[in-house]
Amino acid sequence: MSLNDLQRFRNLFAYEKVDRCVYWGAPAPWAETLERWKKEGYDPTKPLPHPDDGRIVHSTWFFPHPPFERKIIAEDEDTITYINHEGIVMRERKDFPDSSMPQFIRFPVETREEFRQFRKERFRANLEERIGPNYREILSSYQDRDCPLIIIADRWGGFFGGVRAMVGVERACLLFYDDPAFLEEMMDSIADFLIEMMDKIVQYTDVDVFGFWEDMAYKTGPLVGPELYRKFALPRYKRVVDFLRSKGVKYISLDSDGNIYSLIPIWLDAGINVLYPFEVQAGMDVVKVRKEFGKELRMWGGIDKRALAQSREAIDAELRRVEPLVKEGGYIPCLDHSIPPDVPYDNYLYYAEKLWELVNSL
């Protein structure tokens, strides 16, 4: 039995027979990690021992458009303060800005009037500008694909994440109490935008996975109480999910770091059936999640990246921990986040080889 990457993905998530599990083992290292690995023998021009199963992922189509013009506001020896493409004023380190947390100084929306102008100017479903003038040809070409098509709305595709991107974390949390009507107006606009975008996309191609993005939890729990979040977000999730299902999108995913146990029932009630990345250091355990919530919830991620910084024995133990899910199906084993610079290159190579053995052990 031999399947292409699309058939394998679909069969795996349908709990049907596969030739092996999906392999997503390619690294996502920090910039500092790459610098270390190059000193340890990594050559970025050479192919990896086991290339990932193919997947077409688009995660930039839903950002504010037109993007804000990057404008430098201040600069010193170590940092730079600027307006980014989302309209956020942020201060970043000059060395390795992608792997250090910026300081967020101002967000693009502070008032209703600013939000309504923002929505009018940058929440337009203009595919010819977001994808390209030949968007019809691009999307239609995916009908002949041999791997899954995954469309992620990323930072603007959620009912906490999208609000947070406009007003900041603290204001997003307080709006649930201080101005729920304004919060609902923003949530409804996000839902409208997601539906309008996807309604145009599915005219030209089917889609395997649509992805929400939230990142709304820290180490011990969510930033908003589950009951309160259910009240506001569930109706909007359901509206988008019901629309997507009516257009044939079978798998609806959601990405949130942190400890999300108390939010999972909300997302399942909305019809979301794929979650990731299950950060182990935040207490998430994919084996426990499967036992508690069952096979209707598909997953990817859940392998503790910190094991790669320890030893081969730690890597072996971590892969043994998730092995039952690999055998059961509906799960793609991969790291729970990008690889920090305390991971030796040899340890990554060992992990990749052992992961390859695991996905072929069915």
Predicted segments, located by residue:
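Charged, low-complexity surface segments at secondary-structure and domain boundaries
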Residues: C21-W24, T33-Y42, S100-F107, K120-A125
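Short, solvent-exposed loop/edge-beta patches enriched in aromatic
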Residues: K17, R55, A74-D76, D144-R145
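A structural signal for short, hydrophobic beta-strand segments that form beta-sheets
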Residues: R70-A74, D78, P97
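Short, surface-exposed, low-complexity cationic segments
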Residues: R91-Q117
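Segments that shape or occlude catalytic/ligand-binding pockets
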Residues: A26-K71
